[in-house]
Every structure is written in C-alpha cells, then in structure tokens.
A protein has these predicted regions:
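Interdomain motor-coupling "hinge/lid" segment immediately C-terminal to the ATP-binding subdomain
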Residues: 127-250
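Pre-Walker A adenine-sensing motif
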Residues: 1-15
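Conserved lysine of the Walker
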Residues: 31
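Accessory nucleic acid-recognition modules appended to NTPase machines
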Residues: 200-366, 370-373
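Structural recognition of the conserved hydrophobic beta-strand(s) that form the central parallel beta-sheet
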Residues: 114-120, 141
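Short glycine-rich substrate-engagement loop in P-loop NTPases that contacts/grips substrate
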Residues: 53-84
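Hydrophobic positions on the alpha1 helix immediately C-terminal to the Walker A/P-loop
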Residues: 34, 38
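Hydrophobic anchor at the beta1->P-loop junction of P-loop NTPases
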Residues: 23
Length: 446
C-alpha cells in the first residue's frame, strides 16, 4: 500500500491534537484518499460528507442554530452512529461552503467530536474569510507524490535507500550500477510525475499515452477553476500566466517575463493573479533576492520570480510526447534545463523549503537559494556534461561563505568546496531545523 509523507502528521493529529484539521492542496493530489486511509486505520468511527455530492449537508452547516442543532441534523443525515469522543467528522469539498471555517471555533470548543476538512482552492478561498479561526485549526498542504513516495512503487529495498543516504551524508560515490538504476527511475518520475491518477494509470497499463491523457484532463480541470475568479479580465490573465509557464522556463534566465502576457502590463497590477496560482497549488514560485545573504526573506524582490508547475509530469506532457521519449532515452540533445529546475523546485517545495534565486551582472546567476541551519545554500542545476562549470557559484560562495551544491546526472563528488550530487539525492535534502531559543527571563535580569 502506497504511503504518503503526510500520513505521519495526520496520525499525530488524530492521536494528540484537539484542533480541527484542514488538508489543503491542488486538485487530484490524493487528499481524500489519504484522509480516508488514515481514518480507517484509526480507533475512531468517521463520518464523511462530500459537500458537492450532498448539498443538504452544506445547507445544514449553513443554517444550524448552534452546535447541538448541527450535531442533531448531521446525525439524521448519516446511517452511522455518532458517539462523543469516538467520532471524527470528515467534510470534503468544503470550498462549496468555505464559511464552515469561521464556525470551526465553536465546534472545537464544544469538544465532543473531532473535525477534518478538505477541498480544492482552499488557499484561495480562505483569503476571503471575514474571520479565520486562529488557534483552532491545524493546516497541512499536500503536493503531488515526491520522488521518495514514487520510489515505493518499485520495491526499492531499504538497504539501497540506506546506502544512498550514507553516500549523501558522507559524500561518497555511489556504486555505478545503483547510480544508473536510480537515474533511470528519476527520469521515469520526470515523465510520469506525482499526480496519483497518472501514476496509477502507468502502473495499470505501462502506456504513456494514458498518463498524458490524465495530465491533459487535470490541466483542463485547472482551467475550469481559473474561470471561478471574480473578474473576467483576471480570469484571462490567470489562464495566460499558467499557459506561459512552460515557455517562460525556457528563457535563458528562466525568469517569468510579464511583458509576454501584455507589454503594457506591470507586475503590481497583476500580482494577485500570480498569488492565486500559488495559493491554488498549481504553480510554485522562486523569488529573486538582491543579495545571497541570510535571512533571504529580507532580500526578497517579489516582482521578479521564476514560476514552475506543481507537477513535473504535467510539464513534460505540455512539452510534448517526444520530450518524454528523449528523457527516457537519456538523449544528449534534449534541452533539459527547465525540466531539471522544475523538478528541483517541486521536490524542495514539497519539503516545505522556500525557494529563491539570485542574478547579478557582476557575479552571474544562482539557480536556487535556500537556508539550512548553517546559513545560505547555493544550488546550481546542470543538465549536461559541463556540470563543473559554474562561475557564479565560484564567485559567490567565497564572498558570502555559503555552502555550494550542484545537482546533475553525475555521481557524488566533492571538489573545491563544492558538493556534486545526482538529482535523485534531492530526496535527502531537509528543511532548516527550527532553532530552540532559551528565553528564560532570569537571563535578562541585572
């Protein structure tokens, strides 16, 4: 059975958290499936209401006089027995009635039941709420399958993963056979991506045409969602931005050029359209920084950004079937820079890492920057054989004392204070640990 990384957080919530739980994410990333799986394996009885399929329940939520009235009416809407302290209510597709989030405080305060909520476009919808339930709601964002999750489908032994982790940690070369096998699997991941329906189609038929059909269907669903934006002109802009992403990633610097939408537009006038795509979970940003220095957020210039698709399989589908074939065959003529950068952005975002990039006329461009517990990490993504040519990293790592890492198709090595890693080792990159700060007031007394 496929395990998702988010299961651990959901199970911890079931066991130890009295708040309501909100699972957010783009369409078809597997939210409903994993919630059901966790609830079925728990000690609780769960009652699921889909607010699209069951409009009466949405009306009950909308019109209930108080908590007691709500519970009474919900008990009439299900054949399952509702037992205090032993029942979890699962409300799916809550974008139909987003105001349930403003009422969740009263349900949580009541304390008799647990509540889990899910839906699509919630990142967008929540922005319009009059009153957000601060302190009463735990939120988890789900993404397409990561490469680590994808690997489960191929029965890779734990010993192999442990060997790779050791090579990553100790900067040791990987056995050539294992390295080749892992790169082939990573290539397959870039072709199929992490959308569960596409992965399932591949496993059932091994037919890439079925995968492509799934991807195209998902994109069409996204475009229907774009039309739900409140103003007609912005519906068109959102759609145009999304359609342009694959081409914009083929720019020499990968930066999204606003003039390609309309030469008379300025970012400030359409910034909310980009934010809509990010909050909907269908696009991922990497913002420019004016200086590769911690804290990166302080140096962010949000009007300059790279924009990536949230699923690498969808990107390679939009590039065409021949692109997928060239990836699978390791064709040396493929221009894979945009593909490699997108998969890196997807993997790191999945880990909760905020992404930035740096571009200087004096020093050159760094593809990605992020922060770990030791400071800024410089990432270069190389798709060809010249993976050791990176003048920008050479210049910047010395000036700013930053850690430098190059991801490519090649094996592990460490030269001139630069760590070279194969792309599949993205699975071992971790988010910056939260620092523990001692705020004992006695330390500040004279």
């Amino acid at each position: 059975m496929l395990k998702r990384d988010v299961e651990k957080e959901i199970n911890e919530w079931i066991s130890n958290d009295n708040r309501a739980l909100l699972i957010d994410g783009a369409r078809q990333v597997g939210k409903t499936f994993i919630i059901r799986q966790c609830l079925e394996n728990s000690e609780y009885t769960f009652i699921e209401f889909n607010l699209i399929e069951n409009e009466k329940v949405a009306d009950i939520l909308r019109n209930a006089n108080d908590v007691d009235d709500l519970i009474l009416k919900l008990s009439l809407a299900t054949e399952k027995k509702i037992v205090p302290n032993k029942t979890i209510f699962f409300f799916d597709e809550i974008q139909v009635y987003k105001d349930i989030l403003t009422s969740i405080k009263f349900l949580v305060d009541d304390g008799r039941f647990k509540y889990i909520l899910s839906g699509s476009l919630l990142g967008v919808e929540i922005c319009g709420l009059k009153s957000a339930p601060v302190g009463y709601l735990k939120t988890i964002r789900m993404y397409p399958l990561s490469f680590t999750e994808f690997l489960q489908l191929f029965n890779i032994q734990d010993e192999i993963i442990d060997t790779l982790r050791d090579a990553y940690t100790n900067q040791k070369e990987v056995d050539s056979y294992i390295h080749e096998r892992m790169m082939n699997l990573f290539n397959l991941y870039m072709i199929i991506g992490g959308m569960p329906a596409a992965v399932d189609a591949y496993l059932k038929t091994n037919n890439i045409d079925d995968v492509i059909d799934i991807h195209k269907s998902i994109v069409e669903q996204y475009k229907v969602d774009f039309t739900k934006y409140e103003s007609e002109d912005k519906k068109l802009i959102i759609s145009n931005i999304y359609d342009l992403i694959p081409a914009e990633l083929n720019n020499s610097n990968k930066r999204f050029n606003i003039a390609d939408i309309n030469k008379n537009l300025r970012y400030e006038k359409i910034s909310d359209s980009f934010v809509w795509l990010y909050k909907a979970g269908v696009a991922l940003p990497a913002f420019n920084v004016t200086e590769p220095k911690s804290p990166l957020k302080l140096n962010e210039k949000s009007s300059l950004m790279k924009v990536f698709l949230s699923d690498i399989g969808i990107l390679t589908t939009l590039y065409g079937k021949n692109c997928k074939l060239m990836i699978l065959n390791n064709d040396k003529d493929i221009n894979a820079g945009s593909i490699y950068e997108n998969v890196v952005a997807q993997e790191l975002t999945n880990k909760g890492i905020d992404l930035y990039y740096y571009n200087s006329k004096k020093y050159g461009e760094i593809d990605f920057l992020f922060e770990d517990e030791k400071g800024v990490v410089l990432l270069e993504i190389k798709s060809g054989k010249a993976y050791q040519r990176h003048s920008a990293i050479n210049n910047i790592k010395e000036i700013y004392k930053a850690k430098a890492v190059v991801f490519s198709k090649e094996n592990v090595s460490f030269e001139n204070d630069i760590l070279y890693l194969p792309l599949y080792m993205l699975m071992f990159v971790e988010k910056e640990n939260e620092c523990s700060i001692d705020l004992n007031i006695n330390k500040f007394k004279f």
